[in-house]
């Protein structure tokens, strides 16, 4: 199920309007099962099931219908796709949800092979680790990315001001006075933004502005974070493997190495490890007086 969890992390948040309920949700459906995450900006709910649960629940909700888990999951994907990813083509299925103390139930009513098909997603409160993975860490990354983006734009504006100044010093004159601008002052700009634009810019509302405007950046940030974690994991495994791997020369005494012999013999030719001739060569090499760099 690790593949399913990672795929869910890479999915953007979608804004859903179900009757009077405004929700943010993301879903991943594969041949192995599905994972669903839903939030009303007050709580976060989650469900992840495999094919065995899909088969059992389908039998309980649809007595007349028999289908393999792969077909059921494919149908659920087709029913949810317009709701989550293609709002221009409304889904033929109908959706509703109920919230209770124990969790949230998302109900789906559709048709499969000409027969009524019903499905219930039974979501329970998400763990703190899931909330951190899908909201806290990605949103912190998005904030840092946007801050870096603003700094890059500010640096570009300062370069533009220097370019305009160079044109003016060379005698260039602006033909349209209405296009004239003042040199960019970052601190003044930030102060004005905080005072005039911030209340409107940070209005979260029902989550729709976030889901509609920052999907691509959210996915890019989560992908980068997954790659960073994987690289860190691989590095740790490599270090652990190198520290525990046996060394064949640990129990052998170190012999002094002659720098001159090393320079004169750049290529190492392996020889047989047995036989009297080999032992004689070893004994002879030990009797040599090591030669230093200045000897």
Curated annotation (Swiss-Prot):
GO MF terms here are:
DNA end binding; DNA polymerase binding
**PTM info:** Phosphorylated by PRKDC at the C-terminus in response to DNA damage. Phosphorylation by PRKDC at the C-terminus of XRCC4 and NHEJ1/XLF are highly redundant and regulate ability of the XRCC4-NHEJ1/XLF subcomplex to bridge DNA. Phosphorylation does not prevent interaction with XRCC4 but disrupts ability to bridge DNA and promotes detachment from DNA.
Where in or outside the cell is it found? Nucleus; Chromosome
Region annotation Disordered: residue ranges? 228-295
List every stretch annotated Globular head: 1-135
The chain residues annotated with the modification Phosphothreonine are 262
Protein name from the UniProt record: Non-homologous end-joining factor 1
Q: Which UniProt keywords apply?
A: Chromosome, Coiled coil, DNA damage, DNA repair, DNA-binding, Nucleus, Phosphoprotein
Gene Ontology annotations for the cellular component aspect, listed alphabetically: DNA-dependent protein kinase-DNA ligase 4 complex; fibrillar center; nonhomologous end joining complex; nucleoplasm; nucleus; site of double-strand break
Positions bearing Phosphoserine: 132, 245
Chief place where the protein resides:
nucleus
Q: Summarize the record's disruption phenotype note.
A: Embryonic stem cells are highly sensitive to ionizing radiation and have intrinsic DNA double-strand break repair defects. In contrast, knockout mice only have a relatively mild phenotype with no growth defects, neuronal cell death or overt immunodeficiency. Mature lymphocyte numbers are slightly decreased, and pro-B lines, while ionizing radiation-sensitive, perform V(D)J recombination at nearly wild-type levels. Mice lacking both Paxx and Nhej1/Xlf show embryonic lethality caused by severe defects in classical non-homologous end joining (NHEJ).
User: What family name appears in the similarity comment?
Assistant: Belongs to the XRCC4-XLF family. XLF subfamily.
Basic residues biased stretches:
278-295
Determine the domain of life of the protein's source. Answer: Eukaryota
Upper lineage is: Eukaryota, Metazoa, Chordata, Craniata, Vertebrata
Its quaternary organisation is: Homodimer; mainly exists as a homodimer when not associated with XRCC4. Interacts with XRCC4; the interaction is direct and is mediated via a head-to-head interaction between N-terminal head regions. Component of the core long-range non-homologous end joining (NHEJ) complex (also named DNA-PK complex) composed of PRKDC, LIG4, XRCC4, XRCC6/Ku70, XRCC5/Ku86 and NHEJ1/XLF. Additional component of the NHEJ complex includes PAXX.
Q: What is an example of a Pfam family matching this protein?
A: XLF
Which parts form a coiled-coil structure per UniProt?
Answer: 128-170
């Amino acid at each position: 199920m690790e593949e399913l969890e990672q795929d869910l992390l890479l999915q953007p948040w979608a804004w859903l309007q179900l009757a009077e309920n405004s929700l943010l949700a993301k879903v991943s459906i594969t041949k192995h099962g599905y994972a669903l995450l839903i939030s009303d900006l007050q709580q976060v709910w989650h469900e992840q099931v495999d094919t065995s649960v899909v088969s059992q629940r389908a039998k309980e909700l649809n007595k007349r219908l028999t289908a393999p888990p792969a077909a059921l999951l494919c149908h659920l994907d087709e029913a949810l796709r317009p709701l989550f990813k293609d709002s221009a083509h409304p889904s033929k299925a109908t959706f509703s949800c109920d919230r209770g103390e124990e969790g949230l139930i998302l109900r789906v009513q559709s048709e499969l092979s000409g027969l009524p098909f019903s499905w219930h997603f039974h979501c329970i409160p998400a763990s703190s680790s899931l909330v951190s993975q899908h909201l806290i860490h990605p949103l912190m990354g998005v904030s840092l990315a946007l801050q870096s983006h603003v700094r890059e734009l500010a640096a570009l504006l300062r370069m533009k001001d220097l370019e305009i100044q160079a044109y003016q010093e060379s005698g260039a004159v602006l033909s349209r006075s209405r296009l004239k601008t003042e040199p960019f002052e970052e601190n003044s700009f930030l102060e004005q933004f905080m005072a005039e634009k911030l209340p409107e810019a940070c209005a979260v509302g029902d989550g729709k502005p976030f889901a509609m405007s920052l999907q691509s950046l959210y996915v890019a940030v989560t992908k980068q974070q997954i790659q960073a974690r994987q690289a860190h994991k691989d590095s740790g495994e490599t270090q652990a493997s190198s520290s525990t791997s046996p060394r064949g020369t640990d129990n052998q005494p170190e012999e002094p190495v002659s720098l001159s012999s090393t320079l004169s013999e750049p290529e190492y030719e392996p020889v047989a490890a047995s036989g009297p001739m080999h032992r004689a060569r070893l004994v002879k090499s030990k009797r040599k007086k090591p030669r230093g760099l200045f000897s």
